[in-house]
Amino acid sequence: MTVKKLVKSTHPILNKTIQPVSTYDQKLKVLLEDLEDTLYHEEAAAISAPQIGVDQSVALIDMEQEGLLQLINPVVKSQSQETVSDLEGSISLPHIYGEVKRSKMITVQSYDINGNAVELTAYDDIARMILHMIDHLNGIQFTKRAHHILNETEVEAYFDNE
């Protein structure tokens, strides 16, 4: 249980497909705890193992009242044709934001800490965060999907209006 240092945005691990978890053991539990500690330290909404330099297909999403969503080897099984464009950012790319179009609804298969398959359906912001994390696990940063990267003035205007 340690706050880990984030890797720099140019680190090669952020641009490669991450290895699936194959062993559900104490090391995985420690990784999940490290991710949780780092997530809260960074005041982030989500974090993936490659963002702390770990080549394992694991991510966490803070769903606020519902708690933390653990994603282990997540795979999108289906997604809606209906999409929504919204602003995204990443703790890997501080102060950079872009508009990204993503499906409004998704169904994902993942695994729990014991290796049991779990299927979940997510909507709106949670679906967006899951897709963003799965992109991280596939070596895709949100800037590759963004149809518009905001300049400093646009970012200030956006956050002033929230």
From Swiss-Prot:
GO terms for molecular function: peptide deformylase activity. Gene3D superfamilies: Peptide deformylase (3.90.45.10). InterPro entries: Peptide_deformylase, Peptide_deformylase_sf. CDD domains: Pep_deformylase. Coiled coil: none annotated. One of its GO terms (biological process) is translation. Belongs to the polypeptide deformylase family. This is Peptide deformylase-like. It comes from Staphylococcus epidermidis (strain ATCC 35984 / DSM 28319 / BCRC 17069 / CCUG 31568 / BM 3577 / RP62A).
